[in-house]
Amino acid sequence: MRIAAIQSTPVILDAEATVEKACGLIGDAARDGAQLAVLPEAFIPLYPSNAWAKGAAAFSGWDDLWERLWENSVDVPGPITERLAEACREHGIHCAIGVNERESERPGCL
């Protein structure tokens, strides 16, 4: 099995643009002969690594950041997972992709 380990950055806090990017990367991997495309952890919409950085507590924009993170996170299953699945079907490939998943039973929870 040929596996494409894709190192790429998301379009920060923009799920729609990141899904388009991911679908393109999936297609590229398939054209290069991969049967499995593996994309980064929390690729949609981003991995909020700075939340644990030194001095992060002094950042005044956390409320806006967390709201945008939730708004751009993924319902599983949902429209975003369907678009990714369609890209995989179209190109005859499988993918593993990390997402921030919204919890539908508890709004505001990831």
What are the residue ranges of the model-derived segments?
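Catalytic-core segment of enzymes that process non-peptidic bonds
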Residues: 67-110
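N-terminal phosphate-binding loop and adjacent alpha-helix
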Residues: 9-24
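Active-site beta-strand/loop signature of hydrolases that rely on acidic residues for catalysis
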Residues: 18, 26-55, 65, 88, ...
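Extreme N-terminal starter segment of soluble prokaryotic enzymes
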Residues: 1-5
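Catalytic metal-binding/acid-base residues of hydrolase active sites
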Residues: 9, 43, 100-101
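Active-site catalytic microenvironments in core metabolic enzymes, especially phosphate/sugar-handling
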Residues: 60
